[in-house]
């Protein structure tokens, strides 16, 4: 309008250039937005805590006009902060970027893009779009560490007792045909001579007492004065302590069970294998609203065949202390893992002393983020 009113050719030329640029920008964004494809892939869907994960993001479009580098708005997870990645290859129809991050915390998450921005090269138009899919699930598994093997209560049958019972020649449960690897002392010579084939004695296998692992899946208790970003480290320590105890029992060929409550309740048994437990622990959300004391109380009625109990928590209250002492008096050995950043807390010290007086084994676990 200014160019037309003043009759200046220079202004008219500038106006035409701006108008063409505006039309060019609109067409470039519109054509790219209609044909754009955004995909992402992870280097692995299951990784251990502490591993480095690579995410490859590919952006392509079939628009006939160039556009500005696409801006990728990354989704915030416990391992990836929210942020924006600007692709640097200006004008190319296919752009690729590799985003690396460390899996610092255990959990199940969907790292990737929350949205992306398509804009023209002049910056006139910007359109935000969301990807068609939420991306691949990343499962960060807990990493077990070395713990002391559990000791079972006196009078319980251990591995050596079971072996002796299995080798008692005076109490066979059945007789079967010989199999490769059977010891000679199990051969029933009289029965073998009668049947004219080698027969061996079969013995009943006495059941070993199992170990019970109780994990507190309520929101972890953070010591006063500590920043909120320390809470994920408490969750990691809880999960890895539970995985470590179970892994130790499996290596010792001792049965262990672990009831899990929360969004995915289940009764884990060592017969399921350690990988199943690691995946279930990785999906634990620590949003259980039921008090842990009630969970412990529900297990008191099932301690008849339990030789050892492990309790893993971040809080120590007077009711929980009384329940642990009561559990110890019922027979099994009890071990407590108290996960905390402050081991010398004056509020919990009297309760810990009470547990130790009742012959409860108390262990402190300091999270890795201390």
Indicate where each model-derived feature is located.
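An amphipathic, basic-hydrophobic helix/alpha-beta surface used to engage anionic
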Residues: 20-268, 308-312, 326
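Short, structured secondary-structure boundary patches
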Residues: 162-165, 182, 269-272, 277-283, ...
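Von Willebrand factor type A / integrin I
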Residues: 1-31, 56, 283, 287-370
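Flexible internal linker/loop segments at domain or repeat junctions
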Residues: 225-226, 260-300
């Amino acid at each position: 309008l200014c160019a037309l009113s003043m009759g200046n050719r220079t202004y008219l030329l500038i106006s035409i250039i701006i108008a063409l640029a505006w039309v060019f920008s609109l067409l470039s964004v519109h054509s790219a937005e209609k044909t754009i494809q955004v995909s992402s892939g992870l280097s692995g869907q299951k990784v251990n805590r502490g591993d480095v994960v690579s995410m490859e993001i590919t952006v392509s479009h079939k628009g006939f006009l160039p556009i500005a580098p696409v801006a990728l708005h990354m989704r915030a997870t416990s391992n990836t902060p929210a942020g924006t990645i600007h692709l640097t290859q200006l004008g190319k129809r296919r752009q690729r970027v590799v985003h690396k991050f460390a899996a610092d915390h255990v959990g199940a998450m969907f790292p990737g893009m929350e949205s992306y921005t398509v804009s023209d090269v002049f910056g006139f138009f910007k359109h935000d779009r969301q990807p068609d899919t939420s991306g691949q699930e990343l499962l960060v598994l807990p990493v077990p560490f070395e713990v002391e093997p559990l000791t079972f209560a006196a009078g319980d049958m251990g591995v050596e007792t079971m072996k002796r019972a299995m080798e008692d020649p005076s109490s066979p449960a059945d007789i079967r045909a010989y199999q490769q690897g059977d010891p000679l002392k199990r051969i029933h010579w009289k029965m073998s001579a009668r049947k004219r084939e080698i027969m061996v004695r079969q013995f009943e296998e006495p059941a070993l007492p199992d170990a019970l692992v109780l994990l507190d899946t309520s929101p972890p208790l953070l010591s006063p004065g500590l920043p909120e970003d320390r809470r994920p480290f408490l969750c990691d320590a809880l999960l890895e302590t539970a995985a470590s105890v179970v892994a130790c029992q499996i290596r010792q060929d001792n049965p262990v069970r672990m009831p899990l409550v929360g969004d995915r309740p289940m009764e884990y048994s060592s017969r399921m294998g350690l990988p199943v437990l690691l995946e279930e622990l990785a999906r634990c959300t620590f949003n259980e609203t039921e008090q842990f004391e009630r969970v412990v109380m529900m297990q008191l009625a099932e301690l008849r065949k339990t030789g050892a109990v492990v309790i893993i928590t971040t809080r120590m209250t007077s009711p929980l202390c009384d329940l642990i002492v009561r559990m110890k008096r019922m027979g099994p050995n009890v071990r407590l893992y108290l996960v905390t950043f402050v081991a010398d807390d004056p509020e919990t010290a009297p309760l810990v002393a009470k547990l130790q007086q009742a012959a409860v084994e108390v262990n402190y676990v300091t999270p890795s983020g201390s």
